[in-house]
Curated annotation (Swiss-Prot):
Protein name, per record: Protein Tlp homolog
Pfam family, one: Tlp
Homology family: Belongs to the Tlp family.
Residue span of region Disordered: 53-75
Source organism of this protein record: Clostridium botulinum (strain Hall / ATCC 3502 / NCTC 13319 / Type A)
InterPro entries: SASP_thioredoxin-like
Top-level taxon of the source organism: Bacteria
Length: 75
């Protein structure tokens, strides 16, 4: 089996897409939190959003690294 070469050319785009979708999911969860009276659901959504925000921090760092590497020709 032949290994695929490491093709990182679209990593920045993929990470940006994931950031955008994660932000959208946070916003949708915030809307649900505001609308629901179920405390268990609120707690679950709040916890998910906390994890999403942590993931966003990581993705933002990763996109900076990838953008820098892309600029430098992935050396």
């Amino acid at each position: 089996m032949k290994n695929k070469p490491d093709d990182r050319r679209d990593n920045v785009d993929k990470i940006q897409y994931n950031i955008t979708k994660t932000i959208q999911n946070c916003e949708l969860a915030d809307e649900m939190i505001a609308k629901t009276d179920d405390e268990k659901t609120k707690k679950t959504l709040i916890e998910k959003n906390e994890r999403r925000r942590e993931a966003l921090d990581g993705m933002r760092e990763e996109i900076k690294d990838e953008a820098r590497d892309k600029k430098n020709g992935y050396m």
